[in-house]
Amino acid sequence: MFALRAAAKADKNLLPFLGQLSRSHAAKAAKAAAVANGKIVAVIGAVVDVQFDDNLPPILNALEVDNRSPRLVLEVAQHLGENTVRTIAMDGTEGLVRGQKVLDTGSPIRIPVGAETLGRIMNVIGEPIDERGPIPSAKTSPIHAEAPEFVDMSVEQEILVTGIKVVDLLAPYCKGGKIGLFGGAGVGKTVLIMELINNVAKAHGGFSVFAGVGERTREGNDLYNEMI
């Protein structure tokens, strides 16, 4: 009988705590769900400063300019003072004006991932640019990720057989490492990459992800047309 009374008393003491915890979680969820609105205060080329009255978005968050077509995404790169962020535009800033409304998406830039993305070309914000329609992928992943831990990396030294005899003989590639190809214009860097993509797919059954960072549009277009 005494044990039952003690248990009932403990339950009564626990109920206010659970109610307070539930209200705390609800408040946090409501705060996270709230979309922060800001306005553009400066445009300097691809650099756009956005002012927020409250809920300053964290670094690397994606912002979107309201009522703009095509959509323009801004990535937060720096905090300036208490209520202003400096962002980098992921596309052209022509036509932007001071006072234009900006919305915080609440997360970093995310792109589609999965088997549906194989053979597709997308820009940095995950929009398809190969004129083959939308990518029907239900999964997305942020473009920023932590580097894998050293304990998760393989320490075995193994040669990646590329199928290119001059590479495998004179400068073999180590599997799992990084490789740099340096050369002038027109010496065959892109051709070598296309051979690697082809041989990795056919000889090893693997997948290749080609990211054109700072590349000219013509080179990416030529590579795509050659590979299909």
From Swiss-Prot:
The keyword Nucleotide-binding applies. GO terms for cellular component: mitochondrial inner membrane; proton-transporting ATP synthase complex. Mitochondrial membrane ATP synthase (F(1)F(0) ATP synthase or Complex V) produces ATP from ADP in the presence of a proton gradient across the membrane which is generated by electron transport complexes of the respiratory chain. F-type ATPases consist of two structural domains, F(1) - containing the extramembraneous catalytic core, and F(0) - containing the membrane proton channel, linked together by a central stalk and a peripheral stalk. During catalysis, ATP synthesis in the catalytic domain of F(1) is coupled via a rotary mechanism of the central stalk subunits to proton translocation. ATP binds at residues 183-190. One of its GO terms (biological process) is proton motive force-driven mitochondrial ATP synthesis. This is ATP synthase subunit beta, mitochondrial. CDD domains: ATP-synt_F1_beta_N (cd18115). It is found in: Mitochondrion; Mitochondrion inner membrane. F-type ATPases have 2 components, CF(1) - the catalytic core - and CF(0) - the membrane proton channel. CF(1) has five subunits: alpha(3), beta(3), gamma(1), delta(1), epsilon(1). CF(0) has three main subunits: a, b and c. The keyword ATP-binding applies. GO terms for molecular function: ATP binding; proton-transporting ATP synthase activity, rotational mechanism. Belongs to the ATPase alpha/beta chains family. Its EC number is 7.1.2.2. Keywords: ATP synthesis, ATP-binding, CF(1), Hydrogen ion transport, Ion transport, Membrane, Mitochondrion, Mitochondrion inner membrane, Nucleotide-binding, Transit peptide, Translocase, Transport. Its main location: mitochondrion. It catalyses: ATP + H2O + 4 H(+)(in) = ADP + phosphate + 5 H(+)(out).
